[in-house]
């Protein structure tokens, strides 16, 4: 069976319903994955209503992305009980770093853990997350590669670029923006940053050009112009920034533990907090043109051969769904 032969429902905190189409301007990784799977999206808080509408065992697979917030709302109904009635097989999709639930109340932490133990399978962002969840719940866990549909959407890799550095986030611990800013200064180039949801007051007073909020397609086209990326983000999840840079062949300095960084920018990956080595790499990229060209070439080639593009992602994910379906 092909992926779109299965009936797949995907539940998130998003307030929309339906299937993803290619004209969606925000075709980031999670949206792209829904498109490739042919999944029908529903708001997670409407699981009881979806069950009432379709009845038992309507979907072959039900994927749930448990939201970072509003856990107390999920605790008000039998989410897993209803989900297991509605779907023949249930799957959890990681959202954010694997430790995030440990910032919740004790009651919410126990609810979260119990929910994970009831899924038939879990998807995780990085290999370290796979190991974490396998140890936590003793369930089948697979890596869900961070998918981009750049080729299908007609986005072109960069052919020319300006002398500017782009950092991957704002000035909060979640993104590690201050550390990225300090390393970016080594290039003696203008520094640019996206505007994220956690942007703080007075951040605009820094000598950083902040980009306006953009759709994903706009972001990818804009990104193509930059010389180098720096993203010392201590919060490891999907790793989209390092991946986006690699598509364009933009060298990116970042941390160990993020698969997209380690796999696509192996010469520029440092241990958490190793600002000294990060600055050394920055100076080497600035002063050694041969090193820069090698890092650029490697990132682009490794992306082409990775699971992060449609060509390689589809057979990988198809095997996983076929295996879970056969176990039914």
Feature names for model-found ranges:
Residues 104-121:
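Membrane-proximal helix-turn-helix segments that form the acceptor-binding/catalytic region
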Residues 224-237, 250:
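Acidic donor-binding loop of glycosyltransferase active sites
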Residues 220, 242-248, 261:
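Short alpha-helical segment that forms part of, or immediately flanks, the ligand-binding pocket
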Residues 20-30, 150-204, 210-216:
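Conserved catalytic-core segment of nucleotide-activated headgroup transferases in glycan assembly
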Residues 1-87, 267, 271, 311, ...:
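N-terminal pre-catalytic "stem/leader" segment of glycosyltransferase-like enzymes
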Residues 287-325:
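A charged, aromatic-enriched C-terminal amphipathic alpha-helix characteristic of glycosyltransferases
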Residues 120-132, 138-154:
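Donor nucleotide-sugar binding/catalytic pocket of nucleotide-sugar-dependent glycosyltransferases
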Residues 266-276, 284-289:
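Conserved acidic donor-binding segment of nucleotide-sugar-dependent glycosyltransferases
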């Amino acid at each position: 069976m092909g992926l779109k032969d299965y009936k797949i429902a995907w539940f998130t905190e998003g307030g929309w319903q339906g299937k993803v189409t290619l004209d969606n301007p925000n075709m980031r990784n999670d949206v792209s994955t829904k498109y490739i799977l042919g999944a029908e999206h529903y708001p997670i808080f409407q699981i009881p209503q979806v069950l009432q509408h379709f009845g038992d065992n309507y979907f072959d697979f039900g994927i749930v992305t448990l939201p970072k917030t509003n856990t107390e709302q999920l605790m008000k109904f039998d989410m897993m009980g209803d989900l297991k009635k509605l779907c023949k097989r249930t799957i959890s999709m990681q959202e954010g770093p694997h430790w995030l639930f440990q910032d919740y109340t004790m009651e919410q932490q126990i609810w979260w853990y119990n929910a994970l133990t009831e899924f038939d399978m879990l998807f995780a962002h990085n290999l370290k997350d796979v190991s974490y969840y396998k140890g936590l719940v003793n369930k089948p866990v697979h890596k869900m590669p961070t998918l981009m549909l750049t080729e299908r959407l007609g986005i072109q890799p960069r052919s020319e670029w300006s002398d500017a550095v782009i950092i991957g986030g704002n000035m909060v611990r979640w993104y590690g923006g201050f550390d990225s800013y300090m390393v970016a200064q080594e290039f003696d180039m203008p520094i640019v940053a996206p505007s994220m949801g956690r942007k703080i007051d007075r951040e605009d007073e820094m000598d950083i050009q902040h980009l306006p909020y953009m759709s994903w397609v706009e972001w990818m086209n804009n990104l193509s112009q930059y010389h180098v990326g720096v993203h010392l983000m201590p919060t490891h999840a999907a790793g989209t920034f390092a991946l986006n840079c690699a598509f364009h062949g933009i060298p990116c300095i970042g941390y160990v533990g993020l698969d997209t960084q380690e796999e696509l920018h192996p010469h520029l990956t440092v241990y958490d907090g190793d600002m000294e080595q990060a600055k050394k790499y920055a100076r080497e990229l600035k002063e050694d043109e041969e090193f820069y060209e090698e890092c650029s070439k490697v990132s682009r080639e490794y992306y082409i051969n990775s699971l992060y593009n449609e060509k390689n992602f589809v057979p990988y994910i198809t095997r996983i769904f076929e295996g879970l379906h056969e176990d039914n």
